[in-house]
Amino acid sequence: MAIQKILFASLLICSLIQSIHGAEKVRLFKELDKGALDVTTKPSREGPGVVLDAGKDTLNITWTLSSIGSKREAEFKIIKVKLCYAPPSQVDRPWRKTHDELFKDKTCPHKIIAKPYDKTLQSTTWTLERDIPTGTYFVRAYAVDAIGHEVAYGQSTDDAKKTNLFSVQAISGRHASLDIASICFSVFSVVALVVFFVNEKRKAKIEQSK
């Protein structure tokens, strides 16, 4: 009887969760107002083959209402600017996968800044955070409404996400002092091992002489 009550309660909870989830319309990236914002990025270092250093280099980012405008501009309350993975850095990495359902999309996990909407040109200079992984990136700005839902966006690259990309090298986490300490420890271990064997041989000879 107790088991039946538990099963019934579990089914009731599951159905309740499903009904709550179904009550909210699934929000899709393709339904956002595309190109509503003009977004540009200027890395602190540029040129062929240049790779930016996490924790050191900076991005100068600008955004403004695009020339084509947006029919949903009245809904814009906050602009959220994010660092996003470009396709080359998403290959074989499902945790970075692009998904049309915004709730499931993992393209832009790195928050840069959030500011109240202003149609005039806005800018920020952002230092690449120390925990940014090695990869190829672009910047996207979302226009968010009063209830926190994305309604429009603009990005620093084209629709195919192939232009105006930049590369970042992550901090390795290793320091010269650690490498020196590691070498010293290895040398000490070898010396200690040699001394140990020499002492053991000496003890063995003394025992034999007795």
UniProtKB/Swiss-Prot annotation:
GO CC list: plasma membrane
A Gene Ontology biological process term: nitrate transmembrane transport
Subcellular location: Cell membrane
Positions of transmembrane segments: 178-198
Tissue: Highly expressed in roots. Detected in shoots.
Null allele phenotype: No visible phenotype when grown under normal conditions. Reduced growth on low-nitrate media.
Signal peptide from the UniProt entry: 1-22
Record's keyword terms, sorted: Cell membrane, Membrane, Nitrate assimilation, Signal, Transmembrane, Transmembrane helix
Induction or repression: Up-regulated in roots by nitrate. No effect in shoots. Induced by sudden N starvation and by low nitrate concentration.
GO MF terms held by the record: nitrate transmembrane transporter activity
Major site of localization recorded for this protein: membrane
Family: Belongs to the NAR2 family.
Subunit field text: Heterotetramer composed of two NRT2.1 and two NRT3.1. Interacts with NRT2.1 and NRT2.3. Interacts with all other NRT2 transporters, including NRT2.5.
Function: Acts as a dual component transporter with NTR2.1. Required for high-affinity nitrate transport. Acts as a repressor of lateral root initiation. May be involved in targeting NRT2 proteins to the plasma membrane.
Protein name: High-affinity nitrate transporter 3.1
Organism name: Arabidopsis thaliana (Mouse-ear cress)
Native organism taxonomy: Eukaryota, Viridiplantae, Streptophyta, Embryophyta, Tracheophyta
Gene: NRT3.1
